C-alpha cells in the first residue's frame, strides 16, 4: 500500500535547550495541554491512592507522567508540581525519609554510574507499594505508606494482617526502621512472558479497601533498605533472613561491573520469580547516616528498568494509503519510540471507519506494542489532544478495477499496482521497490501499468537517482520479464484468482481466457460464485481489454494471435 500525499502534520517538533524533543506548539496551546495532562494525572493519582482503584495501567501512568515532565521542561516550567506522588492525606512522619531511586536509561548509563563506586549489589526492582516498617522493643509498632517520602498514611492495622510480615524481631532488628515493597505474591512469575499485571494497583487496592482482610494473605514484603543497619552487606542480609525477611538475602547479588548487572537483570526477566518486577536496583553497601536521607537525593542507589512491553507514542501525522485493490488504509506516523530494540515510527490503524471510531488526531498519545513478527500494533488511545485537526480521507471510489491507467487521482493506487506487478507473486522484477517505481513514473510519466516495457536503456539510465549499475539491472529485469509465462502477466494484471486456481484453469492465452464461462471459473479451487463473477467483471473491463491488446503489440507470450 502506498501513502496518500494529502496528510495532516498536526504536531511539528523542535529540540529544546535540554535536548528533549518538544512539540512546536504556540505558548497558549502548550500551557493548555500541560494543564490538561497535569489535571488528568492528578485525577488518576487521587483515585489510585484514595480508592485503591487504577483508572489506567501503571505503565501508561508512568509514561504519561514522564511525558508531562518533558513538556514542562520544553517550556521552562517548574516540574516540582508533577503529580507523581500520592495526595498528602497522611500525617504520619517517616522516621527515615524515602529517597526514591534515580532511573538509568541503558547499559552505558549504568557503567557511568558504577564508575568510582565500590561494594555494589543488585536487587530486583519489585513492583508493588513502598512502606516503612518500624520495630520497637521487638514488636512492629508502625507501618507507614511512602506518601511524599517524608510523611504518609498510617497503615499499621492493615500491615498487621499480612501473615508474611514478621510482627516481632530480635537482636539488632528489635529496634529498627526498615523500608521495603509490599507486593502481590506470585508463583513462578516470568516477567518477560507475563508482564506487569498491574500489580502495583492491585496491591494499593487491597491496602485501601476496608472489607478484604482475607485478600491480604496474598501480599508479601521485600525489604530493600535498613537505614543505619550493619555496614557489612552479607551481615545485613543474614540478619534480615533470620528475622523472616528471607527474600532480600536470596535476591541480592554482589556485582563488580555492568556486565554482571546485565546478567542478573536478564536472568530475573526470564526466570520464575515470586513477585512482579520492572527492572533492577543497584546499590552501594555503604550508605549515609539516616538523618541525611532526603526524597530525591539517594545517590547511592539507581534503577535500570526493563523496557516496557508497550510504549506511549505521540501521533505526529495521519496518513492514508491506497492498495492495489483500492482499499484505503489509515496509518499513524509517530514520534519514534523503541520497542524490543525496534524503532517504531508508524502504526497501521486500519480502515477509515476504524480510524473514525478510534478518533485519533495528530498530537494524541497512543499505546503501541509489537504483535506477531514484530509488527507494531495500536492498543489504545491514552490521551487526546485538545485540538482535533484531522485530515480528510481520499474519495472512496477506488476498487479492484480502478487505476490501471495513471491519473492525478489515481497516483497512489497506480503506484501500488506497479509495486504488485514487480513482486515475486507476479513478474518478479528484482530490485524494483516503491522508490524505483516512483522515480520512473515521475520522470517518464507512464500512461498505464505496463508503460515501462516501452522504455529504452538510455531512458532508464537518465532517470534521476539511478546509478549506472542500477539502471543496467533494471533494463535486464524488464527484458527478462518479456519471457515470463502468460499466467504471470495475468497475475500482474491483478486477476481476482489465486495462482493455484489460475494454474488449474489450464489457460495459456488471452483467447482461451475469453472463452471461459462463469460456470468454468466456479469449478476452480477456492473460487465460488462471487469470485467467479469478479473474474468475469475483470476480464470484460475496458481497461483490461485495452491492456491485453497493448501487451499483444509488445509480443508478450499468450496475448498475440
From Swiss-Prot:
GO terms for biological process: DNA repair; DNA replication. It catalyses: NAD(+) + (deoxyribonucleotide)n-3'-hydroxyl + 5'-phospho-(deoxyribonucleotide)m = (deoxyribonucleotide)n+m + AMP + beta-nicotinamide D-nucleotide. PROSITE patterns: DNA_LIGASE_N1, DNA_LIGASE_N2. Its EC number is 6.5.1.2. It is an enzyme of class 6 (ligase). The active site is at residue 125. The keyword Manganese does not apply. Keywords: DNA damage, DNA repair, DNA replication, Ligase, NAD. One of its GO terms (molecular function) is DNA ligase (NAD+) activity. InterPro entries: DNA_ligase_AS, DNA_ligase_B, DNA_ligase_CS, DNAligase_adenylation, DNAligase_N, NA-bd_OB-fold, NAD_dep_DNA_ligaseB, NAD_DNA_ligase_OB. It comes from the Bacteria. PANTHER family: DNA LIGASE (PTHR47810), DNA LIGASE B (PTHR47810:SF1). Catalyzes the formation of phosphodiester linkages between 5'-phosphoryl and 3'-hydroxyl groups in double-stranded DNA using NAD as a coenzyme and as the energy source for the reaction. Belongs to the NAD-dependent DNA ligase family. LigB subfamily. HAMAP family: DNA_ligase_B. This is DNA ligase B. The gene is ligB.
